[in-house]
Amino acid sequence: MDIQNIKETIAMIEEQNFDIRTITMGISLLDCIDADIDKAAEKIYQKIVKKAGKLVEVGNEIGHELGIKIVNKRVSVTPIAIIGAATAADDYTPLALAMDRAAKEIGIDFIGGYSALVQKGYQKGDEILIKSMPKALAATERVCASVNVGSTKTGINMTAVRDMGETIKIMSKGDKWLNAKLVVFANAVEDNPFMAGAFHGVGEADTIINVGVSGPGVVKRALEKVRGESFDILAETIKKTAFKITRIGQLVGQMASERLNVEFGIVDLSLAPTPAIGDSVARVLEEMGLETVGTHGTTAALAMLNDAVKKGGVMAAERVGGLSGAFIPVSEDEGMIAAVNSGALNIEKLEAMTCVCSVGLDMIAIPEETPASTIAAMIADEAAIGVINQKTTAVRIIPMGKEGEQIEFGGLFGVAPVMRVNKASSADFIARGGQIPAPIHSFKN
């Protein structure tokens, strides 16, 4: 084995903020369906505790053995709208409370799956879940929610987009954490290990382990060694680095699945930043030669980074999936925060960047007076990018405070500068409702 490779791997862990961001256990709740919501809630609690009871213990064991920090151990479950639909209840908060109770019992920080899939229309459970979302998220600490409002195959459910704009607006009047725990998707994936958008798809095995890695600091350090070189060498360097990062994720996932006696799912080939210095995707882009993220060339740099990470990672993992790409959450990336505060990065540029990377407008604070119709229109724009380009896009925005203020979240969530939003109205556009049809290139059968 190449001694230099061993040295580089040790440096990744000790000096460059490399970590496993999450081991997420996906759990099917289809066998917890019951006409009585209280019985369903108890079944949900019992199954999560039974299946994931040792998740934290095993995660800590593996981290200690390998000398790698495994930051989060999490759980995702079947979309609760499906489970709740079998009951006569008009509020699914009891199911959210059962999820929250189970999460606390097993010691995980978040549990995802208070979700609805409404890309082509509402069923009974979907409407009830969305209406109960503000209450359910306010009543729980660790439950995360998501709604899929569009897909390349079905188009965009604009009625759902309108409803989600209103839901986000309602939740903005409560705690700042409510909207930090809600993601609105187009082309949502069934095996996402990252919160807040994780849910366990109905096409998945009963219980699986998915792994998400994190390594922007590792990539930046590698690029520092090839300053001034051509893009060919830049891309090759990123690919080799991504291979090493993903290989460790694969090893951790295999070990976790064996010890928990659960099927191994996927490694998500994502670069996920944190607010820590040296763990920023924005700083990787700047290392490529940009004075600051947000300037002209940012989208091209991000496109190349995203593609090279996938090319390197796909060879290192048995199965890849999830969101797989570079994440650009504003509040969770110190380089992004600095770019927004300097005026170099705005929402319009972030929207352009989401065309070529993972997810979308993520952890962005906007002025609290922003109307629900404008929030819905932002969701519609992101959904359109995803639907037309056959990729996952999402919105996680926090209407709070006034433009220029800083919203403190702390921990992995960081600080969100309140960004300027276009004040021209989209109200008549959003009020139409209905469905934007699927694009012509989706018609492939």
Curated annotation (Swiss-Prot):
Q: Which cysteines are joined by disulfide bonds?
A: none
Domain of life from the UniProt record:
Bacteria
Q: Name one Pfam family in it.
A: DUF711
Q: Which SUPFAM superfamilies match?
A: PFL-like glycyl radical enzymes
Alphabetical list of InterPro entries matching this protein: UPF0210 (IPR007841)
What family does this chain come from, according to its entry?
Belongs to the UPF0210 family.
Q: Subunit structure, per the record? A: Homodimer.
Q: Please give the name of this protein.
A: UPF0210 protein YjhD
